[in-house]
């Protein structure tokens, strides 16, 4: 009997120990799960805060930020679809879940008609060509240059630039400056753009930047974007116009190019010539090197940037190639925006072209930007179209 009691007590204690062990196991598992959850939560929170503090400089488009030193991002923009889509895009790529490293944040802008005036009454480099031929008393133009300048004048009057004129201006442009070194050429451009715009009051040629687009560039820079210009115009001319007006380094400006040679180089190839620091300077050679139109804009991006842009901004058919290229980014989603010059009250516009661009945007998935509907100003409130 004593043996049975002993065994019974032993079995009871054994079962009790098993119950206690099972209960403790459950408690340990629950505590461990809670600890793991807390650790993961804190880790993810710290990761998000790290992005926010150290990398993500996303700025609310409608709120004044101290980062801007009382500058309001996109203050010349109305509430519009383009602004909303850009804001949402920036918020998305600076979010921890869809984060794009700042070294991959690249935006490419066309120049004439996208951030700078192109219709008063024609592209700046065409006006420069015309001025050099007909208004520069120190220069003796060739008969061919006179003929091309006359075509430029005709284009100014009708508001259309033919493919033939583009070809003729592009191929003969360097001949205008054959006696200029690069410093003389840049000074000539600066003197030219320091004069008033013909069709506007209170606006110099060199100040004819679209204020909303300059705000947009600054906004992107605050969000760690690298800004590039890709223009069909001659590269040094674009660099010179931008210098002092928009904070974009010369190395980030892509354009059409002409051969540049040393003053005493003659017909000797560059790889066979030795530069003379005492007598040489550099100037255009009378030969065409590379245009930066259409697909060549993509090639220029590949050659000089070496990465796929996230954003492209253009205004014309010549920008369609790089617009489609940015939307074909395999690593990150890309957006293409097109400026539609549809405000004849504040700017000189071709309404038919603007409406066609809006249709092209619908067909291709580009985002239209309307000067008339999306911008509160173009050049500033004090600038008035004549």
Residue positions per predicted region:
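Non-catalytic pre-domain segments flanking phosphatase-related domains
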Residues: 21-22, 35-111, 119, 123-126, ...
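Electropositive phosphate-/nucleotide-binding environments in soluble metabolic enzymes
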Residues: 80, 179, 295
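C-terminal cap/substrate-recognition subdomain and adjoining C-terminal extension
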Residues: 7, 12-16, 51-72, 99, ...
């Amino acid at each position: 009997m004593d043996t049975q009691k002993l065994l019974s007590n032993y079995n009871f204690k054994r079962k009790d120990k098993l119950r206690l062990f099972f209960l403790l196991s459950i408690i340990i598992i629950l505590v461990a799960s809670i600890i793991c959850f807390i650790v993961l939560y804190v880790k993810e929170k710290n990761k998000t805060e790290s992005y926010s503090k150290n990398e993500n400089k996303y700025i609310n488009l409608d709120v004044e930020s101290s980062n801007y030193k009382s500058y309001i991002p996109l203050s010349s923009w109305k509430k519009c679809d383009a602004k909303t889509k850009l804001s949402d895009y920036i918020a998305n790529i600076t979010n921890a879940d869809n984060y794009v490293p700042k070294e991959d944040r690249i935006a490419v802008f066309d120049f004439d008609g996208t951030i700078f005036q192109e219709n008063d009454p024609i592209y700046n480099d065409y006006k420069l060509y015309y001025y050099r031929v007909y208004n520069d008393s120190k220069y003796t133009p060739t008969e061919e240059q006179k003929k091309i300048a006359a075509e430029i004048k005709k284009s100014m009057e009708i508001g259309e630039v033919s493919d033939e004129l583009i070809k003729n201006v592009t191929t003969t442009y360097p001949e205008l400056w054959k006696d200029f070194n690069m410093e003389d050429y840049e000074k000539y451009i600066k003197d030219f753009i320091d004069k008033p715009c013909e069709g506007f009051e209170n606006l110099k040629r060199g100040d004819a930047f679209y204020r909303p687009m300059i705000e947009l560039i600054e906004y992107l820079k605050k969000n760690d974007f690298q800004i590039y210009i890709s223009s069909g115009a001659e590269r040094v001319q674009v660099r010179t116009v931008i210098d002092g007006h928009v904070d974009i380094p010369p190395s980030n400006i892509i354009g059409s190019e002409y051969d540049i040679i040393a003053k005493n180089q003659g017909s000797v190839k560059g790889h066979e010539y030795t530069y003379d620091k005492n007598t040489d300077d550099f100037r255009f050679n009378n030969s065409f090197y590379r245009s930066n139109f259409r697909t060549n804009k993509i090639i220029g991006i590949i050659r000089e940037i070496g990465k796929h842009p996230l954003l492209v901004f253009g205004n014309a058919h010549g920008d369609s190639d790089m617009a489609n290229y940015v939307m074909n980014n395999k690593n990150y989603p890309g957006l293409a925006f097109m400026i539609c010059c549809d405000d004849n009250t504040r700017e000189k516009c071709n309404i038919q072209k603007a409406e066609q661009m809006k249709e092209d945007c619908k067909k291709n998935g580009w985002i239209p930007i309307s000067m008339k509907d999306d911008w509160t100003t173009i050049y500033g409130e004090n600038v008035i179209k004549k």
